[in-house]
Amino acid sequence: METPLKAPESSLESCNEPSSRTSEQDVATQELARQGEEILSQLYRPLEACTNSCYCKKCCYDCQLCFLQKGLGIWYDRKGRRRRTPKKTKAHPSSASDKSISTRTRNSQPEKKQKKTLEATVETDLGLGR
């Protein structure tokens, strides 16, 4: 009767092993979940100010802000670099922008009529020559 008692004990040990494996897997998945949460928290964390002014390869990849500014050249802040162009003074009072639309179109229409008359004369000349 002793042998049957030992067999169930060994079967219990074999049953305990898979449960220990699953607990190890649970621990591993929990660690991965923590790492994922940490990565996400770093992703959504605002970028910190970096005072490093070096543009070497090591410093360009130092942090996310350095990579964006130095590596990619993206600057989100405006430092007044853009200057507005001064308004142009009108040098000639009779420039094309001062003329009304009807005056400009009136001047361009006679040119079209002249082209049409030239085309008509060319067509008549070709027609007679043949």
Curated annotation (Swiss-Prot):
Keyword Cell inner membrane in annotation: no
Basic residues: bias regions: 79-91
Entry comment on modification after translation: The phosphorylation by CDK9 does not seem to be important for transactivation function.
A GO molecular-function descriptor: RNA-binding transcription regulator activity
Ranges of Polar residues composition bias in the record: 11-28, 92-108
Record GO biological process: positive regulation of viral transcription
Residue stretches of biased makeup (Basic and acidic residues): 109-118
Keywords tagged on the record: Activator, AIDS, Host nucleus, Host-virus interaction, Phosphoprotein, RNA-binding, Transcription, Transcription regulation
Modified residues (Phosphoserine): S94
Positions occupied by motif Nuclear localization signal, and RNA-binding (TAR): 78-90
Family: Belongs to the lentiviruses Tat family.
Role according to the record: Transcriptional activator that increases RNA Pol II processivity, thereby increasing the level of full-length viral transcripts. Recognizes a hairpin structure at the 5'-LTR of the nascent viral mRNAs referred to as the transactivation responsive RNA element (TAR) and recruits the cyclin T1-CDK9 complex (P-TEFb complex) that will in turn hyperphosphorylate the RNA polymerase II to allow efficient elongation. The CDK9 component of P-TEFb and other Tat-activated kinases hyperphosphorylate the C-terminus of RNA Pol II that becomes stabilized and much more processive. Extracellular circulating Tat can be endocytosed by surrounding uninfected cells via the binding to several surface receptors. Endosomal low pH allows Tat to cross the endosome membrane to enter the cytosol and eventually further translocate into the nucleus, thereby inducing severe cell dysfunctions ranging from cell activation to cell death. Through.
Complexes and interactors: Interacts with host CCNT1. Associates with the P-TEFb complex composed at least of Tat, P-TEFb (CDK9 and CCNT1), TAR RNA, RNA Pol II. Interacts with CCNT2; the resulting complex is unable to bind to TAR RNA.
Protein name, UniProt field: Protein Tat
Gene: tat
